[in-house]
């Protein structure tokens, strides 16, 4: 496919984006808004953002959800801007500096919350800065400007949603159904690999792919939830399926690890049974029926606990899968599965990374302020706005540098494109609303195609071009003002990129160490006799951390294996029949406190000291288990955990 070719699957969204822009433009001028540009810009960003992220037409609900986030972020930013102006109107410089800190604070929060919700906080940060900068000549008009901005943005969002609904958005339901079938087959094939106990690298690749696919399925669930309320039952089932899928991965990998020391536990009966290849979900269904008969015949005591647990989880997965596909009423058996353990939310391991993002945003905004005041440039304010936009949006993504480069390319492309519209097209079409709408529809159509291809600079070019062409009421054509705006955008993006390069993010290793220590803490916390604590479901949170570890350290198999071993230890200890008495309960609390100290330690010396203390406590705990005559189901996993911590103590404590 050529660089300028248009694929059939890209046309519908390109028309949708063009429609959203035209609707926003028409409504903006019809209601005599002072700056319809904001409505058009909002419609374009809300519609194109999810398409750029997805690399194609976004699924139903994505545009609507992004629109709601933009409304929330705008209102938070407007309120914050009003509060800052009211409190500091007599000290303009201090007011702008506080706004810079506010933008950094919002970036810090956006780095810690869920990635899909971080957009609202990033927007809240730079919205307040836009308001404070814009009202500098006439501060008394602040409330009016805030209300107008909110109104224009809401109009733009409504237009984007209307265009989305008009062109029958894609439903993700069929993709979810197909993935559920395919995922079950992949789970069975992973168990086959683990029972064969073949090449470790092949097994590592297989479970790593399954972790990614399960995480992707969770993302699909979020999209389905946004799509329509009629999928509420499917959403509940998918949430439980996420835990079941992770349980299947854990039991398969534990089956592999058990054979490293005790291969005789997996009998020939099960080895022969899992030799049968499967290709479809129907094949897996037949095999599971046979497997349940084999277990009923051999008895639970003669069946390895990992295989028994795996079959139970796969059966529940299969039952819920049928419910998701048919979206029928939840029956009593399903309700019993869905009334599972409460999920545990873990503290973010990226606090240092979030603080780096805070300083990047704050310093870049302050640098823009100094540049504006020092040069006295009329478009210094525009440069400041672009700095805030780039840093607020780039920091929450895995590669901020590439986002900044995308904005630089986009603003450079917007200069000649905007020049064409400013000098030729808009002056010749402003007398006719129809011609003006057609001209902007053409812009939206072709850039909509490029956005879906994720062309570098396409998203930045769309936003920057709309931002600099004259879409005010009334239209005024001052070339110097246009040139200042275009150059201000470019300078702002370059300054933001410079700060991102200068303020290095060296938090990767620290984040990795914190993640590994959180796995250790989770394994230690599983040693408890508290009934409520034992019922807590840590599995989704642990695998979410594992997924983050895989993204931070791609290809680092020793780290992944260590993390997976800790997850397996947690699951095994969680179900272990630990003797119930006050002596052990008190010692469990002591070990949890020590594990928390390991995570929160600021220096390597403190971390080593607390980790050494944890190892000593594990030795004492094993002695206590012998005194209280704990069964092998308890002593063996505790012994394995202590051995793992001794083996990897340097990786878990040293920077």
From Swiss-Prot:
<feature type="transmembrane region" description="Helical">
    <location>
        <begin position="13"/>
        <end position="33"/>
    </location>
</feature>
<keyword id="KW-0813">Transport</keyword>
<feature type="transmembrane region" description="Helical">
    <location>
        <begin position="370"/>
        <end position="390"/>
    </location>
</feature>
<keyword id="KW-0812">Transmembrane</keyword>
<feature type="transmembrane region" description="Helical">
    <location>
        <begin position="407"/>
        <end position="427"/>
    </location>
</feature>
<keyword id="KW-0997">Cell inner membrane</keyword>
<keyword id="KW-1003">Cell membrane</keyword>
<dbReference type="InterPro" id="IPR023706">
    <property type="entry name" value="PHBA_efflux_pump_AaeB"/>
</dbReference>
<keyword id="KW-1133">Transmembrane helix</keyword>
<dbReference type="InterPro" id="IPR006726">
    <property type="entry name" value="PHBA_efflux_AaeB/fusaric-R"/>
</dbReference>
<feature type="transmembrane region" description="Helical">
    <location>
        <begin position="38"/>
        <end position="58"/>
    </location>
</feature>
<dbReference type="Pfam" id="PF04632">
    <property type="entry name" value="FUSC"/>
</dbReference>
<feature type="transmembrane region" description="Helical">
    <location>
        <begin position="69"/>
        <end position="89"/>
    </location>
</feature>
<dbReference type="GO" id="GO:0005886">
    <property type="term" value="C:plasma membrane"/>
</dbReference>
<comment type="function">
    <text>Forms an efflux pump with AaeA. Could function as a metabolic relief valve, allowing to eliminate certain compounds when they accumulate to high levels in the cell.</text>
</comment>
<feature type="transmembrane region" description="Helical">
    <location>
        <begin position="459"/>
        <end position="479"/>
    </location>
</feature>
<feature type="transmembrane region" description="Helical">
    <location>
        <begin position="431"/>
        <end position="451"/>
    </location>
</feature>
<dbReference type="GO" id="GO:0046942">
    <property type="term" value="P:carboxylic acid transport"/>
</dbReference>
<keyword id="KW-0472">Membrane</keyword>
<comment type="similarity">
    <text>Belongs to the aromatic acid exporter ArAE (TC 2.A.85) family.</text>
</comment>
<feature type="transmembrane region" description="Helical">
    <location>
        <begin position="93"/>
        <end position="113"/>
    </location>
</feature>
<dbReference type="GO" id="GO:0022857">
    <property type="term" value="F:transmembrane transporter activity"/>
</dbReference>
<protein>
    <recommendedName>
        <fullName>p-hydroxybenzoic acid efflux pump subunit AaeB</fullName>
    </recommendedName>
</protein>
<feature type="transmembrane region" description="Helical">
    <location>
        <begin position="482"/>
        <end position="502"/>
    </location>
</feature>
<feature type="transmembrane region" description="Helical">
    <location>
        <begin position="152"/>
        <end position="172"/>
    </location>
</feature>
<feature type="transmembrane region" description="Helical">
    <location>
        <begin position="121"/>
        <end position="141"/>
    </location>
</feature>
């Amino acid at each position: 496919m050529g660089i300028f070719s248009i694929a059939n699957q890209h046309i519908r969204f390109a028309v949708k984006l063009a429609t959203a822009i035209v609707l926003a433009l028409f409504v903006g001028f019809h209601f005599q808004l002072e700056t319809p540009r904001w409505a058009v810009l909002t419609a374009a960003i809300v519609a194109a953002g999810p398409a750029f992220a997805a690399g194609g037409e976004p699924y139903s609900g994505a545009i609507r959800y992004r629109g709601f986030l933009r409304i929330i972020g705008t209102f938070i930013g407007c309120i914050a801007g009003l509060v800052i102006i009211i409190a500091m109107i007599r000290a303009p410089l201090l007011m702008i500096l506080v706004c810079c800190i506010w933008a950094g604070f919002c970036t810090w929060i956006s780095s810690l919350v869920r990635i899909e919700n971080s957009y609202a906080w990033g927007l809240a940060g730079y919205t307040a800065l836009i308001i404070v900068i814009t009202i500098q000549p006439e501060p008394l008009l602040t409330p009016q400007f805030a209300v107008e901005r909110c109104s224009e943005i809401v109009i733009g969002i409504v237009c984007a949603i209307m265009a989305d609904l008009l062109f029958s958005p894609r439903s993700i339901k069929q993709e979810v159904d197909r993935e559920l079938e395919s995922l079950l087959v992949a789970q069975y094939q992973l168990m086959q690999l683990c029972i064969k106990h073949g090449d470790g690298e092949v097994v590592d690749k297989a479970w790593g792919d399954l972790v990614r696919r399960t995480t992707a399925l969770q993302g699909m669930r979020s999209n389905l939830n946004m799509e329509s309320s009629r999928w509420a039952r499917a959403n509940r089932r998918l949430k439980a399926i996420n835990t079941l899928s992770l349980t299947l991965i854990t039991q398969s990998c534990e089956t592999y690890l058990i054979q490293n020391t005790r291969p005789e536990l997996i009998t020939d009966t099960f080895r022969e049974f899992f030799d049968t290849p499967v290709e479809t979900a129907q094949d897996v269904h037949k095999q599971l029926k046979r497997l349940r008969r084999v277990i009923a015949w051999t008895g639970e005591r003669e069946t390895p606990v990992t295989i028994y647990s795996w079959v139970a989880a796969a059966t529940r997965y299969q039952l819920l899968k049928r419910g998701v596909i048919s979206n029928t009423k939840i029956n009593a058996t399903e309700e019993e599965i869905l009334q599972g353990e409460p999920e545990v939310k873990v503290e973010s391991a990226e606090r240092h990374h979030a603080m780096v993002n805070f300083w990047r945003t704050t310093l870049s905004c302050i640098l823009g302020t100094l540049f504006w005041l020092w040069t006295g440039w009329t478009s210094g304010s525009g440069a400041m706005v672009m700095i805030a936009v780039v840093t607020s949006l780039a920091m929450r993504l895995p590669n901020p540098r590439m986002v900044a480069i995308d904005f630089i390319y986009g603003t450079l492309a917007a200069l000649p494109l905007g020049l064409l519209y400013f000098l030729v097209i808009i002056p010749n079409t402003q007398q006719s609303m129809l011609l003006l709408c057609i001209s902007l529809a053409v812009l939206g159509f072709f850039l909509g195609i490029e956005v879906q291809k994720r062309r570098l600079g396409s998203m930045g070019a769309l936003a920057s071009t709309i931002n600099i062409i004259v879409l005010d009421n009334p239209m005024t054509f001052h070339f110097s003002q246009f040139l200042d705006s275009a150059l201000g955008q470019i300078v702002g993006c370059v300054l933001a990129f410079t700060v991102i390069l200068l303020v290095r993010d060296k938090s990767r290793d620290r984040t990795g160490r914190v993640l590994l220590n959180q796995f250790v803490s989770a394994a230690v916390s599983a040693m408890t006799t508290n009934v409520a604590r034992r019922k807590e479901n840590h599995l989704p949170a642990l695998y979410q951390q594992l997924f983050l570890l895989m993204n931070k350290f791609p290809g680092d198999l020793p780290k992944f294996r260590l993390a997976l071993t800790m997850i397996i230890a947690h699951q095994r200890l969680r179900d272990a029949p630990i003797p119930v008495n006050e002596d052990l309960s008190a010692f469990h609390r002591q070990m949890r406190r020590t594990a928390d100290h390991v995570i929160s330690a600021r220096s390597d010396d403190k971390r080593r000291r607390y980790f050494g203390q944890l190892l000593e406590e594990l030795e004492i705990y094993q002695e206590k288990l012998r005194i209280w005559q704990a069964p092998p189901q308890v002593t063996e996993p505790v012994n394995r955990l202590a051995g793992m911590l001794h083996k990897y103590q340097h990786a878990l404590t040293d920077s």
